[in-house]
């Protein structure tokens, strides 16, 4: 047996290990079924080695198989070769690593942009939610996982990375260069829709955000404000712990979320009455750019009937991943648990369905109409600083207008 063949055999063993370990995630209920599939894999590997038209590069063949194996599970699971993992680890351990400000997934086989942080390198380069990346740094995204894509987009601050962007109405991808930067924590934009409605615009749920929201709510009560809007559009970052802590500011009883996985102990996150700060009316704004921790918050509010969730269905990306290193120096990013709403439905892929569905309209499109003749436009309360995030809400923002309408509607009288 030559060196290449021996390497292929070892690689096949790695695949067997991975397959056996995650077989249940794929829905296989017995080891026999898993190993039958492995037998087929071994036969295919042998035929490639012996019968392929040219002498195959078995490292490439096996790496491709492993990438495909992980990607077949879900959009967030990834496989890193030893070289890829070494690069990933260096960037992960470097606090000065530059980023682009994107939250990514995969759709239609390509990498797709879920959300873009305001004033981030990606936003400055003209990248928008919904953009499809055909390529990143010259590599086709149909052949890469979300983990690989994210790793390619990170690097030394001040350096650029080119992406090929597929956009509606254009036959060829646009070549766009994004210059990486060290990102600063996103600030919460505080606005007033009118004297009685506070608007908190969240573009991330960074550590400490729930405490910041608590302080704003307490301040609002002292000012005689009785209604709140939480804008979760473009909110795709932050730990779920912040979503749970935020939900507890509004929900006095019941379940907020449940975390379940094959090897993860079930965790039930419950409301805590002593943590409630706001008992008045509240509405949340969501759309397809709402993902991750923000979805856990939105689902808790919907399921506990704590207020209206207005807008569009969220993306569906609430899960937990684990980094697993392998003996050959490669690594897996494996989804090990999903978050479920209080009704027991998985948020992953399904997303959160709003209580009031309103089609999202891009603010730029609305502003281009030049209309400003109705509805109370929020008055910005914080200094006009680009680092604070997005611009003040437009009165032509249909999702915002509907939420304001619901909050200001007179209470429905109960039948006698």
Label each region the model flagged.
Residues 2-78, 111, 398-402, 406, ...:
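Terminal targeting/pro-maturation regions of precursor/exported proteins
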Residues 52-114, 158-162, 166-177, 183-190, ...:
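Extended, small/polar residue-biased N-terminal targeting/export presequences
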Residues 322-338:
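Surface-exposed, non-catalytic interaction/assembly patches
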Residues 29-51, 72-110, 362-386:
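Glycine-biased strand-turn-strand hairpin within the trypsin-fold
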Residues 331, 338-416:
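Conserved functional hotspot residues or short segments at active or partner-binding sites
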Residues 110, 184, 206, 256, ...:
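Active-site/binding-pocket entry motifs
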Residues 25-37, 46-53, 57-58, 112-115, ...:
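Cleft-lining beta-strand/loop regions that shape enzyme active-site pockets
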């Amino acid at each position: 047996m030559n060196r290449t063949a021996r390497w292929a055999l070892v690689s096949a063993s790695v695949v067997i290990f991975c397959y056996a370990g995650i077989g249940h995630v794929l829905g296989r209920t017995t080891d026999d079924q898993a190993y039958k599939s492995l037998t087929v894999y071994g036969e295919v590997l042998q035929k490639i080695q012996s019968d392929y038209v040219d002498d195959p590069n078995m490292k490439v063949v096996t790496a491709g198989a492993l990438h495909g194996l992980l990607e077949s599970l879900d959009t967030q699971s990834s496989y890193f070769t030893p070289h890829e993992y070494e690069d990933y680890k260096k960037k992960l351990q470097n606090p000065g690593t530059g980023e682009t400000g994107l939250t990514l997934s995969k759709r239609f086989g390509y990498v797709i942009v879920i959300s873009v942080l305001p004033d981030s390198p990606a936003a400055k380069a003209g990248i928008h939610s919904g953009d499809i990346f055909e390529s990143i740094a010259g590599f086709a995204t149909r052949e890469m996982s979300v983990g690989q894509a994210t790793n390619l987009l990170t690097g030394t601050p001040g350096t650029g990375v080119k992406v090929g962007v597929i956009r509606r109405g254009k036959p060829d991808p646009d070549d766009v260069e994004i210059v990486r930067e060290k990102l600063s924590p996103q600030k919460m934009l505080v606005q007033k829709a009118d004297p009685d409605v506070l608007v908190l615009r969240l573009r991330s749920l960074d550590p400490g955000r729930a405490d910041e929201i608590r302080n704003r709510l307490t301040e609002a009560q002292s000012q005689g404000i009785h209604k709140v809007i939480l804008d979760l559009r473009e909110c795709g970052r932050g730990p779920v712990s912040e979503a749970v802590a935020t939900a507890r500011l509004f929900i006095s009883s019941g379940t907020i979320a449940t975390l379940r996985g094959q090897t993860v102990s079930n965790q039930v996150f419950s409301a805590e009455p002593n943590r409630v700060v706001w008992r008045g009316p509240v509405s949340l704004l969501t759309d397809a750019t709402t993902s991750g921790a923000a979805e856990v918050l939105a689902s808790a509010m919907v399921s506990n009937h704590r207020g209206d969730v207005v807008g569009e269905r969220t993306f569906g990306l609430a899960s937990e991943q684990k980094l697993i290193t392998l003996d050959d120096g490669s690594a897996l990013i494996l989804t090990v648990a999903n978050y479920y709403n209080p009704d027991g439905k998985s948020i992953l892929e399904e997303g959160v369905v709003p209580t009031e569905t309103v089609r999202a309209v891009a603010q730029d499109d609305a502003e281009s109409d030049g209309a400003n003749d109705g509805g109370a436009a929020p008055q910005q309360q914080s200094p006009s600083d680009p680092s604070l995030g997005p611009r003040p809400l437009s009165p032509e923002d249909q999702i915002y207008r509907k939420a304001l309408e619901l909050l200001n509607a007179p209470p429905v009288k109960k039948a006698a």
